[in-house]
Amino acid sequence: MDQDRSGAADAGNPDPGRGPAGSAEARNGAAAASSPAEWAGQLRLSVAERNGRSYAARQFHEGALRVLRPHYLDRSGQVTYTVVNPGGAYLGADAYLLDVAVERDASLVLTTQSATKVYRTPQGPATQDMTVRLGPGSCLEHVPDQLIVYRGGSYLQRTRVDMDPAASLLLAEVVTPGWSPSGESFAYDELRLRTEVRVTPPEVPAPAAPDRGAPAAEAQDRPADPCHVPGGPDRAASSGGTGAAPAGERARRLVVDQLRIRPDAHGGMSGVGFMEGFSHTGQLLVADARLDDELYERLCELVDASGTHSGITRAGTGEPYGVRCVCVRSLAHSTSAITALHRAVVDELRQRWRGQSPLRLRKY
C-alpha cells in the first residue's frame, strides 16, 4: 500500500483554465470538455445559499447517477443530498463523473444511498472523477458509505478540490474487501484513490487605472512600477482591465493524498507495512483555516480512543493562504469501527465550528 501526502511536486504548475468557485468557467468544470456519451453516469450539482438556507441552484444527472430529494437534518440550513446508482455497482470500463460546486456561504452534506460496489472489470478499471469547487464561507462534508471492491475488480478514483481560503472541507472514505469464493480478503486486482486539494483566493481587482488626462507633474510624482517593462503593455490592460492574476496563477496546492493497493504485486497484504492483519482501511481529510493546535490535540485524542489502528498527521505543503490540513489514516477489522471514528471527528468539528448537532443521516 503506497501512500503519498506531500503534494510538493508541481506545486507551482497549476492547471490552466480553472476558474474560481462560482464563476461560469468553474461551473462548467474541466470535465465539461468531455462528451456526456463517455460517461456511464454523471451528476452535476451546484448548491447556493439564500436567507440562511442552502438549496440546489443547478442540478443535472444522466445515466447511472442521480440524487434523491434533499433533506435538512437540523435547523442550520445545511442541505443533505444522497447520490444513488440505480445500476447497483460499477463494472468494467465504467466511467462516472461527479461535478459539485458549493457557492458562497452554502453548506452541503453529500453521501450515498449504499455502499459503492466494484465487481469484476475485465474490460478495464472502473473510474470515478469528482470535481469540487468551494466558494467563500462554504462547507462540504462528503461522507459516502463504504467502497467495496470484489474479486477481479480494479477501481480508480480521482478527486480534485478547488477551495476558497474561507471554505471548509471534509472528505471521508472507508474501503472494504469484497467477498470471494476462495475466502481471500484481498482478491481484487487494484485500487487507487487520489485526492488533490488546491486553495484559490477570490479575485481582488487592482486599483483603477489613472486618468490619462492627468497633469504631467502628477504622473511624475507616482512611484515607478518595478515590474513594468518599457514599451510593454499596461498590466491592468493585459489582464482584461482588472489587474488581477488568473485563477490558475493564484491557486496553491495544499495536499495530495494517494492510496494504492495491488494485492498481487505485494505477495500478500497481511504483513507488516501493509494491512498488518487488518481487513479494512479508511482515510479522512479535513482542510480549514481554523485547524489550530488545540483542535489538533483534541482530534488526536479522538483517534487514540477509537479502538482502531489509526494515525493522524498534519498534511500538506505548508499553509497556503492560511488553510491547514489534517489527515487520518486507519486500519480496522470492520467498517463500523472506522465509520465511528470518522463520525466522532465530524461531530466534533460540526459542534465547534458551526454549533451543529451530531451528523445523523437517517438512511435506514
From Swiss-Prot:
Pfam families on file: UreD
Family: Belongs to the UreD family.
Name of the featured protein: Urease accessory protein UreD
Keyword Cell membrane: no
The UniProt record lists the keyword Cytoplasm: yes
Any one of the GO CC terms: cytoplasm
Record field: compositional bias (Low complexity): 21-37, 209-218, 236-248
PANTHER family found in the cross-reference section: UREASE ACCESSORY PROTEIN D
Organism: Kocuria rhizophila (strain ATCC 9341 / DSM 348 / NBRC 103217 / DC2201)
Main localization (coarse): cytoplasm
Role according to the record: Required for maturation of urease via the functional incorporation of the urease nickel metallocenter.
Description of how the protein assembles with itself and partners: UreD, UreF and UreG form a complex that acts as a GTP-hydrolysis-dependent molecular chaperone, activating the urease apoprotein by helping to assemble the nickel containing metallocenter of UreC. The UreE protein probably delivers the nickel.
Compartment(s): Cytoplasm
Region annotation Disordered: where it falls in the sequence: 1-37, 201-250
Gene Ontology molecular-function annotations: nickel cation binding
UniProt keyword terms in alphabetical order: Chaperone, Cytoplasm, Nickel insertion
